[in-house]
Amino acid sequence: MSKTAIVVVDMLYDFIDGSLACCHAQEAVKAAKSAIERSVVDEPDYPVLFILDHHPSNHSSFKEFGGIWPAHCVMNTRGGEIHDDLKPFVRDDLCFYKGCEVTKEQYSGFEGVSDKGQSLNSCLQALGVKSVIVVGIATEYCVKATCMDLLINGFEVSVIADALAYVDIDGHLKTLEEFEKSGIIVQKKQ
């Protein structure tokens, strides 16, 4: 049996109830927590990796600096923190930060690095992971970019639809269709 991991994308307060709150976010957090709990109950060392948008306060993606987004997930603010319900599953060595450079917009978890400079891809490979279950926010942006990079890099990828939040329902549904066409498994009900 190939080793499986869960990747949690941007389940951060600004995307849940803050400046960029997404549709279905609270429900997605609950579904993600449930999926993680089911995975770790039999295997306490089950890998759960977290991707975090982690911006400096003057990030170029913010409207006030010429970008398209309101300020969000600023370093050392509540908005950039992982939801409390998921914090018990966080291991510092399995957190990957993206968007840390002022002039770089990064959507994919593959662009993030851990505190020790390790990439998501190298970490998954070091753990012997072959299959990845993705949950997170937002389906059309960071979840999509991360899933596509996982697929390109040879991982079997699935998403839990109930554990995804989104900016727009039409974009969410279109992305789920794209996932299925590309070979990503969309789990409709847990």
Enumerate the language-model features and the residues they cover.
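Short, well-ordered secondary-structure micro-motifs
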Residues: 61-62, 106-109, 145, 170-171
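Internal catalytic-core helix/loop-beta-alpha segment
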Residues: 83-137
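Active-site acidic carboxylates
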Residues: 1-100, 155-156, 167-189
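Short, glycine-rich nucleotide/cofactor-binding loops
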Residues: 24-25, 135-140
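A short glycine-rich beta-strand->turn/loop micro-motif centered on a GG-aromatic cluster
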Residues: 133-136, 155-169
